[in-house]
């Protein structure tokens, strides 16, 4: 469990490390921050699409084994990204890196689904999320610090390659001690199609996956440009701007620490509704606040609200198809990161052409509506 959490740390850091680097990348290659956001977009798109490969592979060959192999792939590809000479080469390397990273967090969660009873799964996933959330915070901070440092984005990517290599080797060395689920019989596209049909045959899966897609578009897309927004609006250094937004992860850690009590006291429906309202209020505050320092406390509130919704979605996703849980979690991640890719493309265009107000107003209105719709559906299901 600890090694999987550390693996999730580095995978999550890769998702957020470029947020604070976008202005630096844009300056070095002579492009706008919105265009530089392509390094986030291609990572998310490849990450989402590759779920369709890693999910069935995890069910067939073992989830922990595939996580270790994916980590070593991330090590090699982050080095390739660090050595890229042009922006197109960097985009290609980030896309390949995202494809490899796709095998880490979702398969780790699927392993938890195999090994932990449902009644204990939400608190267990919350503890696992400490690794994921800490990685997001560290990635955000590292991106800002390296953006203001001489090594720039190349140094950030090299540091991540070192971490990937260490964790990947340790995990593969520990495989014989890790509990595994019986493999899904057969191989090839026929089995893959059968597993996907198993997931989608459950009507509740469509609701969970649809809300997850919306979360990716409305939340994760605009989040990528928040350091650039604070840098542009208030003149903050990229390290300070990234540090303020990184407090988002602290809100997630607060959730993880109290997850068991929150589930018992509120129930899933109330958690989801409250989370959506907190996220909407946070984006509104980022848009309207006249001073920079409020961005940090607002990020904490948004982070807490995010995980009230997101961890509930994850827990429901582990039950979409217990017989093909790797594929189910891969489909969940495909929707989340496919949504992020769409969101980054739309938010980048808004940031460059229409202003940050549009970029922030849409999630301020949309996230509460999405969360309330899921809360209502959850109550009906109960």
Task: Show the residue positions of the predicted features.
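Paired small-residue
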Residues: 73, 88-96, 293-301
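Helix-to-loop junctions at the C-terminal end of transmembrane segments
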Residues: 50-62, 255-267, 351-352
């Amino acid at each position: 469990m600890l090694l999987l959490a550390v693996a999730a740390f580095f995978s999550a850091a890769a998702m957020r490390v470029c947020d604070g680097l976008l202005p630096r990348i844009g300056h070095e290659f002579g492009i706008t921050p919105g265009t530089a956001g392509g390094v986030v977009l291609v990572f998310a798109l490849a990450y989402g699409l590759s779920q369709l490969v890693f999910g069935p592979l995890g069910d067939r060959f073992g989830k922990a084994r595939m996580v270790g192999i994916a980590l070593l792939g991330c090590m090699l590809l982050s080095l390739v990204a660090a050595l890229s000479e042009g922006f197109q080469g960097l985009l290609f390397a980030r896309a390949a890196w995202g494809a490899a990273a796709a095998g880490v967090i979702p398969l780790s969660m699927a392993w938890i689904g195999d090994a932990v009873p449902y009644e204990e799964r939400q608190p267990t996933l919350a503890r696992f999320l400490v690794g994921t959330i800490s990685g997001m915070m560290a990635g955000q901070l590292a991106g800002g610090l390296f953006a203001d440092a001489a090594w720039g984005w190349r140094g950030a990517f090299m540091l991540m390659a070192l971490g990937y290599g260490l964790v990947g080797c340790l995990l593969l060395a520990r495989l014989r001690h890790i509990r595994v689920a019986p493999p899904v019989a057969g191989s090839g596209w026929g089995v893959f199609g059968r597993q996907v049909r198993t997931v989608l045959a459950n009507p509740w899966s469509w609701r969970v996956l649809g809300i997850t897609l919306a979360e990716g578009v409305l939340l994760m897309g605009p989040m990528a440009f928040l350091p650039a927004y604070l840098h542009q609006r208030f003149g903050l250094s990229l390290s300070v701007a990234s540090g303020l937004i990184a407090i988002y992860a602290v809100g997630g850690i607060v959730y993880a620490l109290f997850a068991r009590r929150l589930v018992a006291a509120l129930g899933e429906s109330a958690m989801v509704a409250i989370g959506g309202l907190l996220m909407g209020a946070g984006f509104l505050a980022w848009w309207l606040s006249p001073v920079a320092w409020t961005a940090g406390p607002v990020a904490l509130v948004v982070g807490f609200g995010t995980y009230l919704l997101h961890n509930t979605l994850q827990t429901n996703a582990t039950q979409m198809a217990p017989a093909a849980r790797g594929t189910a979690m891969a489909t969940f991640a495909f929707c989340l990161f496919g949504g992020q890719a769409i969101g980054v493309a739309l938010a980048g265009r808004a940031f460059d052409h229409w202003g940050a107000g549009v970029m922030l107003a849409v999630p301020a209105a949309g996230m509460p509506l999405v969360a309330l719709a899921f809360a209502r559906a959850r109550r009906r299901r109960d």
